[in-house]
A protein has these predicted regions:
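S-adenosylmethionine/decaboxylated-SAM
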Residues: 2-24, 31-275
Length: 275
């Protein structure tokens, strides 16, 4: 991944007046994965469950490049809200053909039902879940995502570890507990949980170690990436902004340590495969 300034993200930063809850570091984190999907040629559309006024949708629209469609699911997408969303998307991404590239679905995500998920099996490369915030809402949205996410895709759950939305975290962990071997959490940070298919987490994990810190430093601020356990025991990485004072008991590591971690992970995975 080229670590120069990401022009699409820079453009997004310029549209600050749009109402919404997506923060600058959240946008940078999601942009990293959208750009990675584009850079590696992963096919598939973008699905957002829970749109509100479209602040994060505008970010997603910048990474379609005529090769993906943006599917927005929210019962509030009508009237003035839809007009505002349409205007904002076309303003931020003038090359976008709204009629061709954007699908508006005014149903609750649970109303998409099983048949819809089967019909769209493997269709999406990127799924952003920010719909209902109950444990059951999140659980059901992940059930849908299991069917609709492509092999190399990414799921991002919003409000993970958010103090005001504790049921979201409960829903994610309950789903992972009940469906072992489907998804693994790659990374948590800025109240986002980034999930990949369990059989693809290693390549994403290596990519994150190698390039996420540099990307965020170029496009947001210097960050710390944390790892407290063996990657095979608990591979989830933590993300926070870098501070001048470091905790002496942390699992935080600098970029130069990443090669040793990757080598250890590859060796451990190989050993498991030979058992």
């Amino acid at each position: 991944m080229n670590m120069s300034k990401d022009a699409s993200l820079e453009r997004y930063y310029g549209f600050r007046e749009v109402v919404g809850c997506t923060t600058a570091p959240q946008a940078a984190l999601m942009a990293y994965f959208l750009k990675a999907l584009n850079d590696t040629g992963v096919r598939g559309d973008v699905l957002e469950i829970g749109v509100y006024r479209g602040r994060s949708s505008m970010l997603f629209g910048l990474y379609l490049h005529g090769r993906r469609r943006l599917h927005l699911v929210d019962p509030g997408l009508k009237g003035d809200v839809l007009e505002e969303l349409t205007r904002n998307l076309t303003d931020i991404a003038p090359s976008m053909d709204f009629e061709r590239d954007v699908i508006i679905d005014m149903r609750m995500s649970q109303e998409l039902q099983y048949d819809y998920a089967v019909q769209n099996r493997g269709q999406y490369a990127f799924i952003h879940i920010d719909g209902g915030h109950s444990m059951l809402d999140v659980y059901r949205d992940l059930q849908q995502a299991e069917k609709m996410l492509g092999e190399k895709g990414i799921v991002i759950c919003d409000d993970f570890f958010a103090a005001g939305r504790p049921a979201v975290t409960e829903g994610v962990y309950k789903y992972l507990h009940d469906h072992p071997g489907v998804f693994k959490i790659l990374l948590t940070g800025y109240n986002k949980a980034v999930l990949a298919r369990a059989d693809r987490y290693e390549e994403w994990w290596v990519r994150i170690i190698n390039s996420l810190g540099e990307y965020l430093e170029s496009n947001w601020r210097p960050v710390q990436i944390h790892l407290y356990n063996s990657p095979l025991e608990f591979p989830t990485l933590g993300l926070s902004e870098r501070t001048k004072e470091q905790c002496p008991f942390g699992g935080y590591f600098e970029r130069e340590e990443s090669h040793a971690l990757i080598a250890a992970l590859s060796k451990a995975v190989g050993a498991q495969g030979n058992k």
